[in-house]
């Protein structure tokens, strides 16, 4: 019962699955998911603030997916995918998702992450390529990257949180 109450509180704080309103914004969502990933282990996936479902795995990695989350101002978080190593010393947990509903510009991202570094750029091979900017590693070794697609270069396409050194 206590765990169910904690999950409810976390969901209320994080944003609600599709269909429920909340006042949380994208930046709070990123901060809370980053904080959750810091203490994550393969056995604590169920302790994350979102309900993740195992979608596939291989010899080394579990792949999870979560339902869309509605945030304030008609923002939604979609395509929420999470990877975690099966091995204690394996790759760092990785969370990626796409914001939708409002166009988040690079200037808006830089207001929250002013020290972004260009880490990837289109090479002309596909319309699905992205330009990515990564914030400096925090004290826990986490990095947050922001990608803008060739097809819609002015609006944030996806966010990746790499939960540690690897």
Range-by-range predicted roles:
Residues 11, 85-87, 136-138:
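Generic marker of residues within folded, mature protein domains
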Residues 15-124, 129, 153-166:
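Short helix/turn-capping signatures at newly exposed starts of structured segments
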Residues 130-142, 146:
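Short, intrinsically disordered low-complexity segments
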Residues 144-154:
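Short, exposed beta-strand-loop hairpins at the edges of beta-sheets
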Residues 5-13:
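Bacterial N-terminal signal peptides
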């Amino acid at each position: 019962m206590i765990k169910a109450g904690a999950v409810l509180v976390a969901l209320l704080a994080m944003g609600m699955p599709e269909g429920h309103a909340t006042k949380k914004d994208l930046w709070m969502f990123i901060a809370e998911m980053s904080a959750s990933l810091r203490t994550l282990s393969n056995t604590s996936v169920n302790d994350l603030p979102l309900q993740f479902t195992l979608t596939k795995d291989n010899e080394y990695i579990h792949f999870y997916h979560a339902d869309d989350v509605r945030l304030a101002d008609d923002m939604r978080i979609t395509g929420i995918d999470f990877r975690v190593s099966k091995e204690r010393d394996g790759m760092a947990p990785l969370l990626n998702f796409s914001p939708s509903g409002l166009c988040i510009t690079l200037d808006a991202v830089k207001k929250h992450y002013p020290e972004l570094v260009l880490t990837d750029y289109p090479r002309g091979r596909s319309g699905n390529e992205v330009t990515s900017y990564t914030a400096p590693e925090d004290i826990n070794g986490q990095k947050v990257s922001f990608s803008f697609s060739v097809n819609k270069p002015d609006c944030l396409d996806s966010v990746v949180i790499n939960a540690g050194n690897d």
